[in-house]
Each structure stands twice: as C-alpha cells, then as structure tokens.
C-alpha cells in the first residue's frame, strides 16, 4: 500500500487522514477508500472531509486499460469515476469516489424476491443502455 500512499501524496500534496480497505471484488485489484481534508479552490468551493478511491492492481496492462477506458468513457459523457492520478509504473491509481452503494446492492430486493420494483428496473435499464 506504500506506493498508493506516495501516489496520493503526490496528487493531493498531503498525507491521507485515514485509509479503509474495501471488501474484495471479482478482480485482482484491491480497493481502498482514502479520506482526506480538502482545501477550498476555485473549482472546488466546498472544503472539509472527503474521500477518493485508491486502487492497487497486480497487472499493469489491465490497470492502464481500465484507466484509459474510464477516461475515454468520460470524454463521451458517460458517468464513470474520474481518474485523478496513475502511478508511473501503472500499478496503482486514484479515482473519484462515487459512494458506497453498488448496483448489485441497489437491486438486491428485486433479485432476492424475483420481483423488481419500477425503480430497480429503471436503474437496470439505464445501466444496460450505458453499456
């Protein structure tokens, strides 16, 4: 995790206040929520405690593919996490924190009952259209 802390410090100009490991996902990448105190700037009028996501991968090509695709999708107006910084070796990166609720969790009630609500259906359709 030390390379991730160095990348965060280079990007933000400060050390993180706190880092929490996020539960494992289906990939070999490890995700961390990095908490820090933001400073007020012209493009960021709010300041205070905020967070970003730090990612440490095991495959440089996979990491660079993901960050490249994220930047491309963002340039096309697709709502994806913004990539803030990538390490020189491509093994870790920092991206926007979009919150704690995943699509899997958002449709859990419908998935478990076999009866999706209108809200869950709309969310799934929106996601499929974006793909």
What are these regions (language model features)?
Residues 1, 29-30, 79-81:
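Localized chelating/binding microdomains
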Residues 1-20:
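Juxta-kinase regulatory segment immediately upstream of eukaryotic protein kinase catalytic domains
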Residues 2-5, 28, 63, 67:
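Short, well-ordered alpha-helical scaffold segments within catalytic/effector domains
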Residues 3, 23-24, 58, 85:
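Alpha-helical protein-protein interaction elements
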Residues 12, 24, 45-47:
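Generic structural signal for beta-strand residues in well-ordered domains
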Residues 14-36:
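ATP-binding glycine-rich phosphate-binding loop
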Residues 34-131:
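ATP-binding pocket architecture of kinase catalytic cores
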């Amino acid at each position: 995790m030390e390379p991730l802390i160095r990348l965060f410090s280079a990007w933000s100009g400060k050390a993180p206040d706190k880092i929490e490991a996020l539960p494992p996902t289906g990939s070999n990448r490890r995700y961390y929520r990095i908490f820090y105190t933001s400073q007020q700037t012209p493009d960021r009028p709010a300041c205070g405690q905020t967070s970003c996501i730090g990612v440490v991968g095991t495959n440089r090509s996979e990491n660079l593919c993901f960050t490249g695709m994220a930047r491309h999708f963002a340039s096309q107006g697709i709502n994806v996490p913004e990539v803030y910084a990538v390490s020189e070796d491509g093994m870790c990166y920092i991206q926007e924190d979009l919150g704690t609720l995943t699509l899997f969790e958002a449709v859990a009630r419908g998935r478990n009952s076999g009866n999706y609500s209108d809200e869950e259906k709309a969310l799934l359709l929106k996601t499929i259209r974006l793909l």
